[in-house]
A protein has these predicted regions:
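Structured beta-strand/loop patches that form or line metal/cofactor-binding pockets in enzymes
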Residues: 3-28, 32
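Rossmann-fold dehydrogenase core element
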Residues: 141-158, 177-185
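Beta-loop-alpha module in the N-terminal Rossmann-like domain of NAD(P)-dependent dehydrogenases
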Residues: 84-145
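Glycine-centered tight turns that cap/initiate beta-strands
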Residues: 57, 84, 99, 176-179
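Short, Asp-centered acidic motifs that coordinate Mg2+ and/or phosphate
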Residues: 62, 102, 182
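Rossmann-like NAD(P)(H) cofactor-binding subdomain of soluble oxidoreductases
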Residues: 111, 131, 155-161
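N-terminal Rossmann-like dinucleotide-binding module
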Residues: 22-80
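Predominantly a Rossmann-like dinucleotide-binding segment in NAD(P)-dependent oxidoreductases
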Residues: 43, 159-207
């Protein structure tokens, strides 16, 4: 999604399976469109949904949430039909909905494994927000479930699609950097609400 993630998740995903062509007024793009249901309607899910409004290769068509009031708000804001709205108890029924191609899981880290596996078992492609899982074992179980169901699995990460990252890769491949002896990467963010799930080890894992 260009405004927040360079629309990266749609690029390797869409050609493989999307069945609907774009017909947005004023858009020159007439290729396949990925029809996405977002699971998890929190702050980041909202940012994704807002950014998707300008996407050409993906469209928000459904929601999955445990908060009925949020579902109603999103229905009104994004024009989502009732038949494409689910909660965490009944979203397995999404397998019978031909209008949804994929589910973007944007929930606390500790919930990813179980939710992605259920998405796969429902026959829908899965986009999972980073980090994919709490550990490698969980991640492998998710991969295995998607392979078994013959659906795609993509982690919602964007840096390998960014211009600066691609340039560094090019420089390395063309030996412009010489012999690399040391690399250090640093990243930080404000903790914010001390009661948030990101500070809960069971939900966030390593954070």
């Amino acid at each position: 999604i260009k405004k927040i993630t360079t629309s990266a998740f749609t690029l390797p995903f869409v050609p493989a399976f999307a069945r609907v062509s774009a017909n947005q007024p004023g858009s020159s793009y007439q290729g396949p469109v990925l029809r996405v249901a977002i699971m998890g309607l929190g702050s980041y899910g909202t940012r994704v949904a807002d950014a998707m409004q300008s996407c050409k290769m993906a469209k928000l068509v459904g929601v999955i949430s445990g908060t009925p009031s949020k579902v109603k708000d999103w229905q009104s804001k994004y024009n989502i039909p009732e038949k494409n709205c689910y909660n965490y108890e009944n979203f397995d029924a999404i397998k019978n909905n031909p209008d949804i191609d994929a589910v973007y899981v944007i929930t606390p880290n500790g919930l990813h494994k179980g939710q992605v596996i259920r998405v796969a078992q429902a026959g829908k492609h899965a986009i999972c927000e980073k980090p994919m899982a709490l550990d490698a074992k969980e991640g492998q179980e998710m991969v295995d479930a998607c392979k078994k169901a013959k659906v795609k699995l993509l982690v919602g990460y964007r840096m390998h699609f960014e211009v600066k990252t691609l340039e560094i890769i090019r420089m390395r491949k063309e030996n412009e950097l010489g012999k690399i002896l040391f690399f250090q990467g640093l990243c930080g963010f404000r903790i914010g609400d001390p009661t948030q799930w990101r500070l809960n080890y069971k939900l966030a894992g390593g954070g």
